[in-house]
Amino acid sequence: MLAARLVCLRTLPSRVFQPTFITKASPLVKNSITKNQWLLTPSREYATKTRIRTHRGKTGQELKEAALEPSLEKVFKIDQMGKWFVAGGAAVGLGALCYYGLGMSNEIGAIEKAVIWPQYVKDRIHSTYMYLAGSIGLTALSALALARSPALMNFMMTGSWMTIGATFAAMIGAGMLVQSISYEQSPGPKHLAWMLHSGVMGAVVAPLTILGGPLLLRAAWYTAGIVGGLSTVAMCAPSEKFLNMGAPLGVGLGLVFASSLGSMFLPPTSVAGATLYSVAMYGGLVLFSMFLLYDTQKVVKRAEITPAYGAQKYDPINSMLTIYMDTLNIFMRVATMLATGSNRKK
């Protein structure tokens, strides 16, 4: 599942720099597919025989042409539907924040249970989020350093199969490496692998630096607000409220994963390309926001149930990786939305 989140992360940046949506569709660009109607009127043998009208259905070739033909008016409508979907998700999130944050739920949440937590549970959660902050900082530094290298930036932005394959291999390899090293037995190699993983993810984020510092700073603030609000919801909600969403989230991740891959091969101005792109971006934003709720409660649950002196030790670096990937996916989609909005105003 972590590998699928990595793929969803990698396939977004190339779309930011392609011409996408505009506010009004040009009247010169219209859908050229016409609906042919065939009227079959058999010879009349009797005065009472009625005319029979049948509609010829579209062939597979016509459906393919309709899906791939540029239609900016339809693309704009698809984009608007995606934004309304995100707005609906934001409204639900605000409602949940008010409901659980104001203590209107009768069930006990993690924030109430924190009063009776042993000190080692508090230390585990604290160290997990400290590593999360460190990962975000290392990722930002890595992205800024790579942005100063024209050769590396050209390599990351080419979009060739070699670039995509090398990026996937580096992300998956670094993720497997950092998870395979023991936190207790090999703290030195574990931290080196953690820094390597954050650096690789910074290389993936680096193409977004072309959008400019002010826009990325806004995206960072918006992401901080989203992550902070959702983390508060997860902490105030009943401790296992969102842990039952694993199966639906897995299905949604598969859909966003397939849409992210499919959008790489279709033009963004076609109906099919715009639909897949909207699912990958807007649907992905809502999906990874829900993943953040799930992963936050999963981290808290793991910190509570892992024995203090058991054979299996708590690993704060491995625990924070899923929250880290959720945060990066949210940030990249917010930055993409802000970039397309800025281009539309121009």
Swiss-Prot record:
Q: Does the keyword Transmembrane helix apply?
A: yes
Instruction: Give the way it sits in the membrane.
Output: Multi-pass membrane protein
Q: Where in the cell is it found?
A: Mitochondrion inner membrane
What Gene Ontology terms describe where this protein resides (cellular component)? Answer: endoplasmic reticulum membrane; mitochondrial inner membrane; mitochondrial membrane
Record GO biological process: apoptotic process; calcium export from the mitochondrion; calcium ion transport; inner mitochondrial membrane organization; mitochondrial calcium ion transmembrane transport; mitochondrial potassium ion transmembrane transport; negative regulation of release of cytochrome c from mitochondria
- The record places the following residue ranges in the Mitochondrial matrix compartment, namely 46-83, 148-160, 213-214, 267-272
Its domain of life reads Eukaryota
Summarize what the UniProt record says about post-translational modification: Undergoes AFG3L2-mediated proteolytic degradation, upon hyperpolarization of mitochondria.
Q: Which UniProt keywords apply?
A: Apoptosis, Membrane, Mitochondrion, Mitochondrion inner membrane, Transit peptide, Transmembrane, Transmembrane helix
Please name every pair of cysteines joined by a disulfide bond in this record: none
Q: Which residues lie on this side of the membrane: Mitochondrial intermembrane?
A: 105-126, 182-191, 236-245, 294-346
What this protein is reported to do is described as: Plays an important role in maintenance of mitochondrial morphology and in mediating either calcium or potassium/proton antiport. Mediates proton-dependent calcium efflux from mitochondrion. Also functions as an electroneutral mitochondrial proton/potassium exchanger. Required for the mitochondrial tubular network and cristae organization. Involved in apoptotic release of cytochrome c. Inhibits AFG3L2 proteolytic activity, stimulating respiration and stabilizing respiratory enzymes in actively respiring mitochondria.
What name does the UniProt record give this protein? Growth hormone-inducible transmembrane protein
Organism lineage reads as: Eukaryota, Metazoa, Chordata, Craniata, Vertebrata
